[in-house]
Amino acid sequence: MSRSLAHRRSIVGLTSILTVIAVIAAFLALSEFSSRVSPASAAPTDAQPSPGSSLGTEALIAPVDDSAESAEPPSFRNVVMVLADDLDWKLFDQIPRLAALKELGMTFTNHTVVDSLCCPSRVTILRSQYIHNHKVISNIEATGGGWPTFKRLEEHKDNLPVWVSRAGVTTALFGKYLNEYPTRPGGIRYIPPGWDEWAVPISRGDSYSGYSYTLNDNGELVRYGTKPEDFLNDVLNEKARNFIADTNEPFFLYLSTYTPHKPFATAPRHLGTHLGTVAPRTPAYNSIGENEPRWLAKFPRLSDWKLSRLDKTWRKRAQSAETVADSVEAVMAELAATGKDKDTLVVVTTDNGYHVGKYRMPKGKRTPYATDTVVPMIAIGPGIPAGVEVDAMTSTIDLAPTFTEVLGGQVPDWIDGRSLVPFLPSGKAPENWRNAVLSESIGETNKSDPDYLPFIPPPFSALRTPRWMYVEYDDGARALYDQLTDPYEIRNVVDSVDPAFVAALSAQLAQLERCAGPSCREADAITITDPLPQVTP
């Protein structure tokens, strides 16, 4: 039995208007973001070597003046997080209204999820813990995850909304919470502690399609049908705007979309857009890599028919991702209209990434590769320099401590993450910042899981540094990718570099796999000397 497997068993899983080009209005800081830009009709380019690079951005905007950087972190009264579902960097950059955000705020280009799976990642966002610590390892109760597991472990009583509520902050969650909410425990009208305003679809319905769903709206069950005005994302956006307008106290708003998760729901106004787009033809697209791990090596190349189907999937995902831009637009417009843009931090990110045609895999997530684990993360607000890219290693475990610090709350000493507040004045990493982050895939999946796919890797643990991605699979396979010379992670060099270097990476990975709280911040700060010269690809 591999060391990773033994460890795991110990815990038991955003319109395209085809003839019109609109312009995003220039504004300072968080002024109204209400114009639209026509999505590109050509295939995405691959000029950018890093997942979050701003190369190729075509949005017409006026960046915020960042000439006067402050030595002290900016001060905010409110926080808004817009969380997408399954949004990778390639798709983000294809949506001009989303790509434009990189010129409005600070982009964290190495922001990594702890698990490329909805529920475990969302629990991490709330708890600032790796999944081996919060133990919600999958989407559904049957395989050790979902809302029932979160509640059974009583983690719903000690997480982000509770921490900021204690500081007098008014909280709201509109949209997706956790998979299988609210089956059984607490009942279908149940609202977890810490939330003052709550509009969350219950699991009995078709939330992912955007229609025919039921909202738990502050304890009242409200049924929505199939009319255009019933589209879930639009309903949630209106609730978010009303909350911003009506709340006079400091607030935390968590606006959580179901898009662009399959079946790639979108508003009627976005149907028929992005018709000329195709899935990104990166060097890894339908490719055969070098020295592939066993689970991947068995896949044949995708047929032309399958590739054409993937292009259709990509177009649907682009249409769906437009609704994420709608959500950001709604929030930004209301903040500007109410003057609350002057003291609000807005963070736009996602629970995990997604791949379409990577190697010979059709569509999905749950791999250690950057498409699935290195995700969009933008921080926008007064005092945050615009157009700045941060390449330091950050993680979803850092969101809760960041928001809690901004809002004047206190986090428990058992959290695994670090606050990102020190980055906000300039984008420079504070002293003793981490050198690596951990991603894990522990939980099993089955056909009742909304993210079930027959082609996922065996359980794994992965260590990601600014240069390297090292992964150990539970079937004994290992892989190492030099992202400096191989940004698409095609060449596994684990057998061709100094074994001592691989051993050092493995040792650090082992420490992170079993870390908890302060020991995570010790393990991720270990520095390992590169065995290869610093060269450009």
Give short role names for the model-derived ranges.
Residues 69-74, 89-91, 202-231, 244-396, ...:
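Active-site-proximal cap/lid insertion segments
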Residues 193-206, 352-358, 398-400, 405-479, ...:
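C-terminal cap/loop subdomain of S1 sulfatases and analogous C-terminal strand-loop tails that border
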Residues 25-57, 67, 525:
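C-terminal region of N-terminal signal peptides and the immediate post-cleavage residues
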Residues 81-84, 88-172, 183, 203, ...:
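Active-site segment of extracytoplasmic enzymes that catalyze sulfate/phosphate-ester chemistry
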Residues 79-80, 85, 164, 176, ...:
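A short aromatic-rich beta-strand->coil structural motif
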